[in-house]
Amino acid sequence: MGARECPARLLLLSLLLLPLGLPVLGAPPRLICDSRVLERYILEAKEGENATMGCAESCSFSENITVPDTKVNFYAWKRMEVQQQAMEVWQGLALLSEAILQGQALLANSSQPSEALQLHVDKAVSGLRSLTSLLRALGAQKEAIPLPDASPSSATPLRTFAVDTLCKLFRNYSNFLRGKLTLYTGEACRRRDR
């Protein structure tokens, strides 16, 4: 293989692989509105939780990881401004992404990381990146920006707590997707249909 052929083949390979990322990166806003899409991510999170339920020592973290509180007061949620809902979901997703990445690093540094556990964590990292892109396409990031006339004191800080095991991290991930993310995307999709 000559020196000139190698860059040409790399370019060709890049062009062939480029479309693999396009369905998520250039995702239409309607994709997240298809309940099957969100259900797939919820199922992956639940599978991760189930896979980690049986392990004890190997699934404990050497330090606590901060995650978003997933409890939802439905009465208060329905009365929240769209921007506040978007902010809570966007901040929660960002914190959850950081938590999963931190869990991934702690798992990789553990004495004997299981390949199966590593696979579930890797799926969660990938899933959160995809969900972030889908929410961005839906406009959640723009909605999460506070209005100029909104007072800084009106924004409530994101409630958080700490987890110390991989199972609790996956449970939080699953609950966040089933709760706040599902509520927000459902309402955002209904607004888009109007």
From Swiss-Prot:
It comes from the Eukaryota. Disulfide bonds join C33-C189, C55-C59. Produced by kidney or liver of adult mammals and by liver of fetal or neonatal mammals. GO terms for biological process: cell surface receptor signaling pathway via STAT; cellular hyperosmotic response; embryo implantation; erythrocyte differentiation; erythrocyte maturation; erythropoietin-mediated signaling pathway; hemoglobin biosynthetic process; myeloid cell apoptotic process. Transmembrane segments: none annotated. One of its GO terms (molecular function) is cytokine activity. Residues 1-26 form the signal peptide. Its main location: secreted. InterPro entries: 4_helix_cytokine-like_core, EPO/TPO_CS, EPO_TPO, Erythroptn. It is found in: Secreted. The keyword Cell inner membrane does not apply. Glycans are attached at N50, N64, N109, N172. GO terms for cellular component: cell surface; extracellular space. Keywords: Disulfide bond, Erythrocyte maturation, Glycoprotein, Hormone, Secreted, Signal. Hormone involved in the regulation of erythrocyte proliferation and differentiation and the maintenance of a physiological level of circulating erythrocyte mass. Binds to EPOR leading to EPOR dimerization and JAK2 activation thereby activating specific downstream effectors, including STAT1 and STAT3. Belongs to the EPO/TPO family. This is Erythropoietin. The gene is EPO.
